[in-house]
């Protein structure tokens, strides 16, 4: 200590001139300590709020509840404040969730009137000048009134303007088809159709007199009104089959005219809105109504006009983690205006893609939908506030629901559910992941001669291709037509002939333009037509400066640690810290990270032991061999992924690298050989739809979500503290913090490998599927050891759950190699190889 017990420095620290060395040393230490935290402090205060932020996430704003999940259902600017509500998973009668009010200075107020539930509704009622969100009505001064759950039970999923008395009443819709009209002055609800959570509690004799909607599907999401109807969406299906199979019939879009319900379409739908957005349409009799949905083939976009009703279009999916017949994996996709009054700018979220959506979109004026960029966050709602975008997210669920797999081991979810807001610039939706995406119009389905597919989005991608599979009895002509301007005028683009039982791959050139494309066939077929589009890959292999401080994979030393979000309202992140040093691992102790991003050592052996037992990295859940990474999923399907730096094999086998963990609700972040992947839940087809996000050369030990942030360990011991690197008070532990979507800046996906490397193969037996989708600059080298020429079928699977299709058939002479550079427009999900004779063969792919 510099000071003695009495507080005096004494004379022993002075030289003969009376100079106090220890005092100077103390000043020097304080100076350099302040330097090491200067960058972090600047980042904490640059918004003018004084609160620490990391990648647009303010830890102190995190939302917690006592439920199995804590998602953000709505974020709305009102009364000079930002208002947010959270939800638990199935709580139609209330919960521990709260109504939050956030000031421009980012101070958070938790409203004592909060009654919780599973709300995601929000509407501003212009005539009464009130915001309705959840069971709350908020006036222009911020006063809150509450509609009790005993009067209006259900999981409030949406509001709509009243069809007959819009100035005095609004509609409430629940996720289980409960419908109410509410007086905006008295807040008295009148039951229209009973929520099935209430109905199911009644005796059978009581149910007979209760009005129920009895719509197709379950798990309601969106509601909107106009053109004389109220439109409502269900995005799921009930039953055990829906929990396991993603491609069964599920969900519905329905409309109600004030008397009767009508089924519009039997698919999974989510958002229902219009150009009026949160206010309702300005011209309800004529303004369009929009609806978004999906099936196992592609995204579905519906638009209603008053004269002819509904028209439907299709768009590709960037991510399949939103799939699942039960509908649980979507949260609330939205279309919202994030522009200004002078310049509207509608942003659509759907299946992992930010989309630019035209504010005047109709069936006759359908031009302008464009992909902006892909994202990883799970977003429940968003708005523009103070020239920033604010995304309300669903980050850390204590219960991982159906998202279990052996590759995670026996790991648990966080001890307490929590989520946060994500603040970004208005341009952020254009700056994240590549827009590579795919979708089918027909998938192994019977098609009549002359039948047209639904229009599929054709504009917005630099690389476009189509895969066709024809299971007919005779050759068929597939004719493609385009709507060049989105006004329903179709012109022929090209016709291709496909032999019976065969497939065809075609690329489109830059001169083949149009807003929408459709296809027809001139003879009966069981057909698959998949459009696979490539985005421009402008990233390099170098990570951004945000990742400075992470240890390199070949480094002998690193600061590691297992991570666990604590429960029991502690609201901290536990870190069971370790040192890696020249192949040896030593425990450092137990630390906790708090909302101010202080990492402090704690004397808590019980929690440390709990973490080591329940969050250990599993062993032997993937196999790294000479050719690739072998994955055997929970359904015993085999998949292969590219290799990275050779050191990853040793570290993986030593269980020093986390392989799989949920860091955004109901999907996993998979990590193998230096590549992060988005991995859908098994009920959304799992590894078949895996998507590479970024590749790197870092030694990442563990990763987890906490207060909306992505937290990682595996830090260079010499790294200094900054915006992203948090060091402990004793300097012996450290973590990296950021947003999950920072991962796009790690480096573009790359790797080498293949399903065969000097592998003994049997004639006619396909190789394991090997991932080829979402990479660029791809090349192939094939060889064999046979004494006679070998013919290889190179097959691709563009869908993930569709048929294998022939890409090329090549013959390789003895002692020679076949080399191929895939065209830039080539896009498929998986590739495999088949030899026509027994031999030892190599199929080696390089993704640079």
Where are these predicted regions, by residue range?
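Beta-propeller domains
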Residues: 83-116, 134-148, 181-183, 193-194, ...
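Blade-level signature of beta-propeller repeat domains, shared across WD40, Kelch, NHL, RCC1
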Residues: 381-443, 702-758, 771
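Repeated scaffold domains used in trafficking and secretory/extracellular systems
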Residues: 67-74, 114-128, 151-168, 197-227, ...
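A short helix->beta-strand "capping" segment at the edge of beta-propeller domains
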Residues: 45-68, 546-556
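Loop/turn-rich, solvent-exposed surfaces of beta-rich toroidal or solenoidal domains
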Residues: 289-291, 298-299, 315-362, 456-459, ...
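Beta-propeller blade signature
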Residues: 97-104, 181, 243-260, 301-306, ...
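Beta-strand-rich domains and repeat architectures in extracellular enzymes and scaffolds
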Residues: 60-97, 116-123, 455, 556-579
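Noncatalytic modules at the cell exterior or secretory-pathway interfaces
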Residues: 510-527, 824-839
């Amino acid at each position: 200590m510099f000071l003695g017990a009495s507080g005096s420095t004494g004379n022993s620290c002075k030289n003969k001139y009376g100079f106090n060395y220890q005092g100077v040393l103390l000043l020097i230490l304080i100076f350099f300590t302040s330097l090491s935290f200067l960058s972090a402090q600047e980042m904490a205060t640059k918004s003018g709020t004084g609160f620490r932020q990391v990648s647009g996430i303010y830890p102190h704003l995190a939302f917690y509840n006592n439920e199995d999940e804590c998602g953000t259902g709505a974020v709305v600017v009102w009364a000079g404040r930002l208002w947010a509500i959270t939800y638990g998973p199935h709580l139609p009668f209330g919960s521990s969730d709260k109504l939050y009010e956030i000031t421009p200075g980012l101070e958070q107020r938790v409203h004592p009137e909060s009654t919780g539930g599973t709300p995601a509704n929000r509407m501003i009622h212009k005539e009464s000048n009130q915001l309705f969100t959840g069971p709350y009505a908020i006036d222009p001064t911020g006063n809150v009134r509450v509609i009790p759950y005993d009067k209006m039970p259900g999981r409030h999923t949406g509001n709509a303007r009243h069809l007959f008395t819009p100035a005095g009443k609004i509609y409430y819709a629940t996720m289980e088809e409960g419908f109410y009209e509410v007086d905006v002055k008295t807040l008295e609800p009148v039951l229209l159709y009973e929520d099935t959570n209430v109905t199911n509690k009644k005796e059978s004799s009581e149910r007979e007199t209760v009005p129920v909607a009895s719509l197709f599907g379950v798990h309601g999401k969106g509601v909107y009104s106009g053109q004389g109807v109220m439109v409502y969406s269900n995005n799921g299906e009930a039953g055990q089959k829906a929990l396991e199979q993603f491609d069964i019939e599920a969900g519905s879009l329905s409309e109600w005219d004030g008397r009767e319900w009508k089924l519009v379409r039997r698919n999974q739908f989510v958002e229902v809105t219009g150009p009026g957005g949160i206010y309702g349409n300005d011209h309800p009799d004529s303004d369009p109504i929009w609806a978004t949905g999906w099936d196992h083939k592609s995204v579905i976009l519906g638009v209603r006009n008053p004269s002819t009703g509904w028209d439907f279009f299709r768009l590709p999916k960037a991510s399949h983690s939103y799939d699942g017949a039960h509908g649980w994996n979507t949260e609330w996709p939205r279309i919202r205006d994030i522009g200004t009054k002078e310049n509207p700018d509608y942003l659509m979220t759907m299946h992992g893609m930010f989309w630019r959506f035209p504010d005047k979109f109709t069936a006759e004026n359908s031009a302008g939908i464009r992909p902006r960029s892909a994202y990883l966050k799970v977003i429940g709602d968003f708005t523009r506030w103070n020239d920033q975008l604010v995304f309300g997210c669903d980050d850390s669920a204590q219960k991982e629901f159906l998202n279990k797999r052996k590759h995670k081991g026996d790991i648990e979810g966080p001890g307490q559910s929590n989520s946060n807001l994500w603040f970004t610039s208005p341009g952020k939706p254009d700056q994240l992941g590549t827009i590579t995406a795919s979708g089918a119009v027909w998938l192994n389905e019977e098609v009549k001669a002359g039948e047209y597919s639904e229009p599929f989005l054709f504009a917005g991608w630099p690389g476009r291709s189509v895969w066709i599979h024809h299971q007919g009895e005779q050759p068929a002509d597939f004719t493609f037509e385009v709507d060049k301007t989105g006004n329903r005028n179709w012109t022929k683009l090209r016709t291709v002939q496909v032999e019976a039982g065969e497939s065809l791959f075609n690329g489109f050139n830059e001169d083949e333009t149009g807003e929408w494309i459709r296809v027809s066939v001139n003879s009966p077929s069981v057909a698959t037509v998949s459009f696979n589009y490539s985005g421009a890959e402008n990233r390099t292999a170098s990570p951004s400066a945000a990742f400075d401080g992470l240890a390199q994979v070949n480094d002998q030393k690193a600061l590691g640690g297992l991570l666990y979000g604590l429960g029991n309202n502690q609201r901290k992140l536990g870190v069971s810290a370790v040192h890696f040093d020249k192949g040896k691992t030593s425990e450092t102790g137990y630390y906790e990270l708090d909302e101010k991003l202080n990492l402090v050592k704690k004397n808590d052996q019980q929690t440390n032991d709990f973490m080591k037992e329940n969050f250990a990295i599993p062993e032997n859940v993937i196999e790294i061999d000479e050719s690739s990474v072998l994955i055997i999923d929970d359904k015993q399907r085999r998949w292969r992924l590219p290799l990275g730096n050779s050191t990853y094999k040793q570290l993986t086998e030593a269980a020093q690298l986390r392989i799989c963990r949920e860091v955004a609700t109901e999907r996993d972040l998979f990590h193998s050989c230096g590549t992060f992947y988005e991995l859908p839940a098994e009920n959304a087809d799992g590894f078949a739809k895996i998507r590479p996000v970024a590749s790197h050369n870092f030694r990442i030990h563990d990763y987890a979500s906490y207060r909306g942030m992505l937290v990682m360990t595996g830090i260079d011991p010499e790294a200094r503290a900054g915006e992203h690197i948090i060091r402990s008070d004793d300097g012996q532990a450290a973590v990296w913090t950021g947003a999950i979507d920072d991962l796009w800046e790690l480096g573009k996906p790359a790797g080498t490998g293949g399903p065969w490397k000097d592998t003994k193969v049997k004639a006619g037996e396909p190789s394991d599927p090997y991932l080829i989708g979402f990479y660029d600059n791809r090349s192939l080298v094939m060889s064999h050891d046979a004494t006679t020429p070998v013919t290889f079928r190179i097959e691709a699977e563009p869908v993930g759950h569709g048929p294998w299709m022939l890409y090329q058939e090549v013959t390789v002479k003895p002692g020679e190699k076949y080399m191929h550079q895939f065209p830039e427009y080539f896009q498929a999900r998986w590739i495999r190889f088949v030899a026509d004779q027994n031999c030892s063969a190599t199929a080696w792919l390089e993704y640079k």
